[in-house]
């Protein structure tokens, strides 16, 4: 294999991969290949990505958990500035790990990437003052196909780092803060998603 190190089936969940590109540094700075199709195929990952996206979010923002139902997306995600805790939840009905989650800290410093196959819900929490988040997807956004699930469903039990608060029966951000007092910040839509038992299955 060339310029990447791949950890497969992280958290015991089939298909989830953590990818670490080789970083070549010297006194001037560094260089790395953030994506190389040949290296990915040599690692057994053969995915055709069609779009790159980038977002900026401030500390305490939680985006998710999202998916597309009829046009599911595989995502390759990374943080190019700041730090996020990135989460994938298995929604594949026939999977032995249905309803299980795994989380990875992604940062500009560790340069890790998280590969999330089709059939998962995905989201992230921003832990730094700001974070820029980049992701490749293998299908386009379809506005009428959006799905989601509650980020704090106790049946799933995601352990969001630095987050304090008490579950009150919904995905509302009310009462949740980070350890430094920063209020949790979710979109109105993301505060209305339901739990696993009422969520779409692939």
Task: Describe each region flagged by the PLM.
Residues 1-109, 128-130, 137-202:
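Non-catalytic, conserved peripheral segments adjacent to functional cores
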């Amino acid at each position: 294999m060339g310029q990447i190190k791949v950890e497969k089936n992280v958290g015991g969940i089939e298909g989830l991969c953590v990818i670490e590109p080789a970083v070549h540094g010297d006194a001037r700075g560094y260089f790395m290949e953030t994506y190389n199709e040949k290296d990915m195929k040599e690692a057994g990952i053969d995915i055709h990505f069609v779009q790159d996206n980038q977002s900026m979010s401030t500390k305490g923002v939680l985006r998710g958990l999202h998916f597309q139902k009829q046009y599911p997306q595989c995502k390759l995600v990374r943080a190019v500035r700041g730090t996020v805790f990135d989460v994938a939840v298995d929604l594949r009905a026939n999977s032995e790990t249905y309803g299980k989650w795994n989380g990875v800290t992604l940062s500009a410093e560790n340069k890790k990437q998280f590969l999330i196959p089709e059939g998962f819900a995905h989201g992230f929490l921003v832990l730094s003052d700001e974070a820029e988040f980049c992701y490749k997807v293998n299908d386009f956004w379809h506005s009428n196909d959006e799905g989601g699930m509650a980020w704090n469903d106790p049946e799933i039990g995601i352990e969001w780092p630095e987050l304090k608060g008490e579950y009150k029966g919904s995905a509302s951000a009310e009462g949740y803060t980070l350890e430094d007092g920063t209020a949790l910040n979710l979109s109105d839509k993301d505060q209305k998603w339901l739990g696993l038992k009422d969520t779409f299955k692939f």
